[in-house]
Amino acid sequence: MEAFRRGERSPAEELEAVYAAIDASPLNAFCHLDREHATIAAGVADVSLPFGGVPIGVKELDQVAGWPHSLASVPLRDEIATGTSTQVQRIRDLGGAVLAGQTTSSEFGGVNVTRTVLHGVTRNPWRLDRTPGGSSGGSAAAVAGGIVTLATGSDGGGSIRIPGGFCGLVGLKATFGRVPMSPNAHYGSLTAVQGCLARSVRDVARWFDVVNGHDPRDPLSLLRVEGWEAGLGTLTDQVRGMRVAVVPDWGDAVVSPEMWDLLAGAADELIRDAGLARVDGVDTGLPRMGRAWAVSGSVGTAAVLGDRWPACKDDLTPEIRASMENNADVYDAHSYALIERKRMEVNEAMAMIFDPVDGVDLVITASNPDVAFAAEGPLPKTFGGIKGGAGNNGKLTFPANLHGNAAISIPAGDVDGLPIGLQVVGRHHTEPLLLELALLVERNRPWPLIAPVVQGAPS
């Protein structure tokens, strides 16, 4: 951005370089390019805006009017968006970003591996045989691989934090409602939030400066908060003394011991550098979601597919097909009420964990139970040699979605060249404090900004 303002490089030149990188990339991070409109936008970009002239990727679950809106699913491959997501509209119109194209996602955003029948396999720029995660896998791969500086993401169960952890990026899951889900916001999506994947804490803060704030089309969206970027580095006194629980197995998760040993060291450093107060013995237990979490996702998928199911089942990715088949018997009001009861149980438990008097201010855990797994899948069932089941892959992240908390994944080192992420979860409305903590990590444990795109295992 500064190079644009100094006249050293133009947005048009940057966009041309982005498209050249996409054409040459082995990552399969993009599934639709809008060269014509992006070229026009780059030519007239206002470089004084926060992201003026900067090409970005747009996750394919977002909407851009006139672009495909397949939700990464073959049965919807001919759908075209008639509106534009509020986040995308704001980052384009208020932020000045240039929409280069659409990044790949897992089908319906329902799996944390970005591999679909429609678009094929998206690969991790740190090792091409590994996944960037999901569902915002294409966005994470594109940013970590140096193709674009930023890309949109969404997080309904970890879909920003999981790929952020796998790809060595900053991934902020904001408080529920921070960024409007419009157009077409609906009460069935009470866990999902909008955001971005970025290499730096400052870019994330600047992004939210642009996109946050109420939209009447989403009645659950929050009022605007100013000063995200300006506040960076000014909140050290506010974070000092915050009570923190370090919980490697949050949500009954199984975590790789080797990975956690490294993350525990990063957690200790953060606690020391920020002056946090570690609290042991606080009950951080959560009710087991069991089948309820899978059923809740399948209900949404069933609503989107409508009469196409079950005739379309052979066109679906294995995990989505299996989820639909396994949960087809519970698509009724009584079963959905049981799901909501389970959500309420989790809400009560989370409220106790973060109780202002008897609880903690922060929970530190991992972003993922292990390093990135095979790009083609399947979802792993063992983690550092310990059995955990396929459902273990999202256990660390979904509690913040169910309760609506703010949470962030921060790059915290690597295991054999594969990035690992430290997840910090706070109360609602604590995003500035989480960004302050991430800034401390960024300054004291700087991470590589762009991954070396390599094939197979590191030498």
List the model feature ranges, each with a label.
Residues P11-E16, G43, E229-A230, P257-V282, ...:
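Acyltransferase
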Residues M1-G156, A274:
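Gly/Ser-rich catalytic/binding loops embedded in alpha/beta enzyme cores
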Residues H69-D78, S256-P257, F373-P380:
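Glycine/threonine-rich flexible loop motifs
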Residues M1-R6, P75-E79, A192-R199, M324-Y331, ...:
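Short, well-ordered beta-strand elements within core beta-sheets of diverse protein domains
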Residues V18, G53, K59, D93, ...:
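Glycine-rich, small-residue loops and helix-cap segments
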Residues K173-D261, R445-S459:
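A short helix-breaking turn/cap at a secondary-structure junction
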Residues F51-L71, Q238-V247, V295-E348, S409-P419:
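Short helix-loop capping/hinge segments that flank enzyme active sites or metal/cofactor-binding pockets
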Residues G83-S85, Q89-D215, N401-D414, L418-G421:
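Short glycine/serine-rich loop segments
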